[in-house]
Protein backbone atom coordinates (compact mmCIF):
# COMPACT_ATOMS: atom_id res chain seq x y z
CA UNK A 1 0.00 0.00 0.00
CA UNK A 2 1.26 3.45 -0.89
CA UNK A 3 2.00 5.80 2.01
CA UNK A 4 0.85 9.38 1.38
CA UNK A 5 1.95 11.63 4.25
CA UNK A 6 3.28 14.92 2.81
CA UNK A 7 1.39 18.23 2.96
CA UNK A 8 0.87 18.35 -0.82
CA UNK A 9 0.15 14.64 -1.16
CA UNK A 10 -2.49 14.59 1.55
CA UNK A 11 -4.05 17.92 0.44
CA UNK A 12 -4.40 16.68 -3.14
CA UNK A 13 -5.82 13.33 -1.96
CA UNK A 14 -8.37 15.06 0.28
CA UNK A 15 -9.58 17.30 -2.54
CA UNK A 16 -9.77 14.39 -5.00
CA UNK A 17 -11.35 11.69 -2.82
CA UNK A 18 -12.86 13.69 0.10
CA UNK A 19 -11.21 11.38 2.62
CA UNK A 20 -7.75 10.73 4.03
CA UNK A 21 -5.43 8.23 2.34
CA UNK A 22 -5.70 4.62 3.56
CA UNK A 23 -2.52 4.91 5.65
CA UNK A 24 -4.38 7.11 8.18
CA UNK A 25 -6.13 5.79 11.29
CA UNK A 26 -7.86 7.73 14.07
CA UNK A 27 -6.49 7.94 17.59
CA UNK A 28 -9.10 5.45 18.83
CA UNK A 29 -8.27 3.01 16.01
CA UNK A 30 -4.58 3.32 16.90
CA UNK A 31 -5.30 2.79 20.60
CA UNK A 32 -7.28 -0.35 19.76
CA UNK A 33 -4.10 -1.68 18.10
CA UNK A 34 -2.04 -0.94 21.21
CA UNK A 35 -0.81 2.60 20.54
CA UNK A 36 0.16 4.55 23.65
CA UNK A 37 1.06 8.17 22.86
CA UNK A 38 3.52 8.45 25.76
CA UNK A 39 5.43 5.42 24.43
CA UNK A 40 5.76 6.72 20.86
CA UNK A 41 4.99 3.21 19.63
CA UNK A 42 2.66 3.84 16.66
CA UNK A 43 5.10 2.43 14.09
CA UNK A 44 5.48 -0.71 16.21
CA UNK A 45 1.76 -1.46 16.58
CA UNK A 46 0.57 -0.04 13.21
CA UNK A 47 3.46 -0.08 10.70
CA UNK A 48 3.06 2.44 7.88
CA UNK A 49 0.13 4.19 9.57
CA UNK A 50 -0.25 7.82 10.64
CA UNK A 51 -2.76 9.42 13.01
CA UNK A 52 -5.52 11.37 11.29
CA UNK A 53 -9.23 12.03 10.98
CA UNK A 54 -10.01 13.21 14.49
CA UNK A 55 -11.98 16.41 15.14
CA UNK A 56 -9.96 19.59 15.67
CA UNK A 57 -12.01 21.90 17.90
CA UNK A 58 -10.46 25.23 16.76
CA UNK A 59 -11.01 26.53 20.32
CA UNK A 60 -8.50 29.35 19.81
CA UNK A 61 -10.31 30.45 16.66
CA UNK A 62 -7.14 30.58 14.56
CA UNK A 63 -8.85 28.85 11.62
CA UNK A 64 -11.80 30.41 9.75
CA UNK A 65 -15.07 29.68 11.55
CA UNK A 66 -18.42 29.32 9.83
CA UNK A 67 -21.75 27.94 10.97
CA UNK A 68 -21.80 24.18 10.43
CA UNK A 69 -18.08 23.93 9.59
CA UNK A 70 -16.08 21.24 11.33
CA UNK A 71 -12.33 20.78 11.22
CA UNK A 72 -10.31 17.56 11.28
CA UNK A 73 -6.59 17.04 11.64
CA UNK A 74 -3.96 14.61 10.43
CA UNK A 75 -0.27 14.09 11.13
CA UNK A 76 2.13 14.91 8.29
CA UNK A 77 5.63 13.52 7.66
CA UNK A 78 5.31 10.83 10.34
CA UNK A 79 7.60 7.83 9.98
CA UNK A 80 8.22 6.37 13.44
CA UNK A 81 8.68 7.16 17.12
CA UNK A 82 6.93 10.11 18.70
CA UNK A 83 4.60 12.23 16.58
CA UNK A 84 6.08 15.49 15.25
CA UNK A 85 4.54 18.98 15.13
CA UNK A 86 3.43 18.88 11.46
CA UNK A 87 -0.35 18.70 10.98
CA UNK A 88 -2.78 19.26 8.15
CA UNK A 89 -6.20 20.70 9.05
CA UNK A 90 -9.13 20.23 6.70
CA UNK A 91 -12.68 21.52 6.98
CA UNK A 92 -16.01 19.95 6.11
CA UNK A 93 -16.16 22.36 3.15
CA UNK A 94 -12.61 21.47 2.06
CA UNK A 95 -10.48 24.37 3.21
CA UNK A 96 -7.00 23.02 3.89
CA UNK A 97 -4.39 24.53 6.22
CA UNK A 98 -1.07 23.37 7.58
CA UNK A 99 0.84 23.95 10.80
CA UNK A 100 4.48 23.05 11.35
CA UNK A 101 4.61 24.33 14.94
CA UNK A 102 1.88 22.23 16.59
CA UNK A 103 -1.07 24.62 16.12
CA UNK A 104 0.68 27.90 16.96
CA UNK A 105 0.40 29.26 13.40
CA UNK A 106 -1.52 28.13 10.31
CA UNK A 107 -0.96 28.62 6.58
CA UNK A 108 -3.66 28.03 3.96
CA UNK A 109 -2.40 25.56 1.36
CA UNK A 110 -5.56 24.84 -0.67
Swiss-Prot record:
Top-level taxonomic group: Bacteria
Compartments in which it is found: Secreted
InterPro entries associated with the record: Barnase, N1-like, Ribonuclease/ribotoxin
Top-tier EC class: hydrolase
Keywords, ordered alphabetically: Endonuclease, Hydrolase, Nuclease, Secreted
EC number: 3.1.27.-
Active site: 73, 102
Keyword Hydrolase among UniProt keywords: yes
UniProt-recorded Gene Ontology molecular function terms: RNA binding; RNA endonuclease activity
GO cellular component terms given for this protein: extracellular region
UniProt record similarity statement: Belongs to the ribonuclease N1/T1 family.
Biological function: Hydrolyzes phosphodiester bonds in RNA, poly- and oligoribonucleotides resulting in 3'-nucleoside monophosphates via 2',3'-cyclophosphate intermediates.
Name of protein: Ribonuclease
Species name: Niallia circulans
Amino acid sequence: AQVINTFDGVADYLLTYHKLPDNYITKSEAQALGWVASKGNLADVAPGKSIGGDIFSNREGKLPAKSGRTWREADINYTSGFRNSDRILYSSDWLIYKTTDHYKTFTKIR
